[in-house]
Amino acid sequence: MDNVVDRHVFYISDGTAITAEVLGHAVMSQFPVTISSITLPFVENESRARAVKDQIDAIYQQTGVRPLVFYSIVLPEIRAIILQSEGFCQDIVQALVAPLQQEMKQDPTPIAHRTHGLNPGNLNKYDARIAAIDYTLAHDDGISLRNLDQAQVILLGVSRCGKTPTSLYLAMQFGIRAANYPFIADDMDNLTLPTSLKPLQHKLFGLTIDPERLAAIREERRENSRYASLRQCRMEVAEVEALYRKNQIPCLNSTNYSVEEIATKILDIMGLNRRMY
């Protein structure tokens, strides 16, 4: 493996820059380098584009290394200014559009903000996503057991195993109505599936975690407590995993997975439709 090299990476767009970030991060993850990321959204006029160019040039002058620039910009006059910079510039969308244009024998009609902006064609989808987020927040950590039948998935697990961030990611990224229910220390003496969840067993998904990792996470929250002790964590994890087995609840060990990976595995295992926004 080559030596690790620091590089400055720009993600530039005339919109939110989310597309530039996602594709740029995917590309950069293939290289063993430490990067310093700079995201610049809404570069929509020439004066802002020139300021961005100056920022790129300044880093080049300071480091002697060309910054990497991933951009997605519709207006050619704005693109031209960025291309005059000292950065190594890559039009991430055009790299995919050009071969598709040839294959489909059809010219694209690029419009700024089409991917993540609001327009009459996607308002219903946007409203559905906001409703999913509201639902998920209202049903976080067992706050409310009302309307659980409206959930598309109900995550179960001990405290600090990743239920809340995964639920929110499912709602925000995919518009999934995700509730979650915690099993706490007081439940462990006689752990059973709550009556309110039994009719919804087809929507239940369990999260578990290595006790050592759980103890480390809890220690940051409540140092030197029984709650964070390895013995307590081992007991809780063992009890919850036994409950999953007894009730045939699909489950996943979240220890070595990111929130994005956990959410994607849940969608796959539960057969939930992915909806991109």
UniProtKB/Swiss-Prot annotation:
<dbReference type="GO" id="GO:0016776">
    <property type="term" value="F:phosphotransferase activity, phosphate group as acceptor"/>
</dbReference>
<comment type="similarity">
    <text>Belongs to the pyruvate, phosphate/water dikinase regulatory protein family. PSRP subfamily.</text>
</comment>
<comment type="function">
    <text>Bifunctional serine/threonine kinase and phosphorylase involved in the regulation of the phosphoenolpyruvate synthase (PEPS) by catalyzing its phosphorylation/dephosphorylation.</text>
</comment>
<keyword id="KW-0808">Transferase</keyword>
<feature type="binding site">
    <location>
        <begin position="157"/>
        <end position="164"/>
    </location>
    <ligand>
        <name>ADP</name>
    </ligand>
</feature>
<dbReference type="InterPro" id="IPR005177">
    <property type="entry name" value="Kinase-pyrophosphorylase"/>
</dbReference>
<keyword id="KW-0723">Serine/threonine-protein kinase</keyword>
<keyword id="KW-0418">Kinase</keyword>
<dbReference type="GO" id="GO:0004674">
    <property type="term" value="F:protein serine/threonine kinase activity"/>
</dbReference>
<dbReference type="InterPro" id="IPR026530">
    <property type="entry name" value="PSRP"/>
</dbReference>
<keyword id="KW-0547">Nucleotide-binding</keyword>
<dbReference type="GO" id="GO:0005524">
    <property type="term" value="F:ATP binding"/>
</dbReference>
<dbReference type="GO" id="GO:0043531">
    <property type="term" value="F:ADP binding"/>
</dbReference>
<protein>
    <recommendedName>
        <fullName>Phosphoenolpyruvate synthase regulatory protein</fullName>
        <ecNumber>2.7.11.33</ecNumber>
        <ecNumber>2.7.4.28</ecNumber>
    </recommendedName>
</protein>
<dbReference type="Pfam" id="PF03618">
    <property type="entry name" value="Kinase-PPPase"/>
</dbReference>
